[in-house]
Amino acid sequence: MANNASLEQDQNHCSAINNSIPLTQGKLPTLTLSGKIRVTVTFFLFLLSTAFNASFLVKLQRWTQKRKKGKKLSRMKVLLKHLTLANLLETLIVMPLDGMWNITVQWYAGEFLCKVLSYLKLFSMYAPAFMMVVISLDRSLAVTQPLAVQSKSKLERSMTSLAWILSIVFAGPQLYIFRMIYLADGSGPAVFSQCVTHCSFPQWWHEAFYNFFTFSCLFIIPLLIMLICNAKIIFALTRVLHQDPRKLQLNQSKNNIPRARLRTLKMTVAFGTSFVICWTPYYVLGIWYWFDPEMLNRVSEPVNHFFFLFAFLNPCFDPLIYGYFSL
């Protein structure tokens, strides 16, 4: 939340005993009109994303039950199921937390939930990003090395398991760095409480390194992998078509154009496009703040809220994309 980040950055003193910070500025964050609009949009997207992702899971389950007994789901549908679960997890954790936090402005839930919910928030953001990587890698291997993929039946299970495990592990530091701080004006009890990372890093570069690590894992690395995988798929298809269009038998069909594989290629490209459109504004704002914290005072509050809301569109778009292309 932008106003909380500003509050944390503005203070330069903390007590090692009780994390109490003297209130040197009379202005505390409040719920403004633009904040109310952000909350309204957040809960609308929450309902939309929950409905879309839950509907796709139900549809996938019904489709599975109609299949012949003993016949397993295709690799792609198994991966889509994991991505849907990850998106639903992000929807159920991140959006309500953001909406309620913007309503209350300060943190009332205590230090335990401060740590746990901060951990769950980052975990639920890692999971869909890593699942996007798994889908991109799987589609790339399916086109460039189809025989190798078919012979390694456990590869898909290993990649999805690794994605979940990395999400759990990489979010771990949140349990340590997030803590409660209390602002006081010197006249009595604390007048404002917040859940932040204030005084959690011994040196400034420790925090910079951690922020860059999370930024890389959530955005840069997944984006690069998706771009490389899509480029390899397009290059492989183009090369085979140029050699002999009749040799392009990627769907195990002898005479037909591989429509299923081309459809999954379009779907992975659509995933990547949605990922870039939804997350780029969010991370551009975050990087700008890292290098220039005062930018929050120069950029209007409605613009800040607008950029942050872009990230909530991704779990809404994904079920529309794979619902359109896969079923």
Swiss-Prot record:
Disulfide bridges in this chain: C114-C195
Glycosylation sites: N4, N18, N102
Annotated keywords: Cell membrane, Disulfide bond, G-protein coupled receptor, Glycoprotein, Membrane, Receptor, Transducer, Transmembrane, Transmembrane helix
Regions of this protein lying in the Cytoplasmic compartment: 59-77, 138-164, 232-280, 326-327
UniProt KW Membrane keyword: yes
Keyword Hydrolase among UniProt keywords: no
SUPFAM superfamilies the UniProt entry points to: Family A G protein-coupled receptor-like
Gene3D superfamilies: Rhodopsin 7-helix transmembrane proteins (1.20.1070.10)
GO cellular component: plasma membrane
Membrane-crossing residue ranges in chain numbering: 39-58, 78-97, 116-137, 165-184, 212-231, 281-299, 306-325
GO molecular function: gonadotropin-releasing hormone receptor activity; growth hormone-releasing hormone receptor activity
Topological domain spans for side Extracellular: 1-38, 98-115, 185-211, 300-305
Membrane topology annotation: Multi-pass membrane protein
Compartments (UniProt record): Cell membrane
Major location category of this protein: membrane
Matching InterPro entries: GPCR_Rhodpsn, GPCR_Rhodpsn_7TM, GphnRH_fam_rcpt
Induction data: Expression oscillates in a diurnal and melatonin-dependent fashion in the preoptic area (POA) region in the hypothalamus, with maximal expression attained during the dark phase of the light/dark cycle.
Protein's GO biological process: cellular response to hormone stimulus; circadian rhythm; G protein-coupled receptor signaling pathway; negative regulation of cell population proliferation
Record's function text: Receptor for gonadotropin releasing hormone (GnRH) that mediates the action of GnRH to stimulate the secretion of the gonadotropic hormones luteinizing hormone (LH) and follicle-stimulating hormone (FSH). This receptor mediates its action by association with G-proteins that activate a phosphatidylinositol-calcium second messenger system.
Protein family: Belongs to the G-protein coupled receptor 1 family.
Protein's UniProt name: Gonadotropin-releasing hormone receptor
Organism: Rattus norvegicus
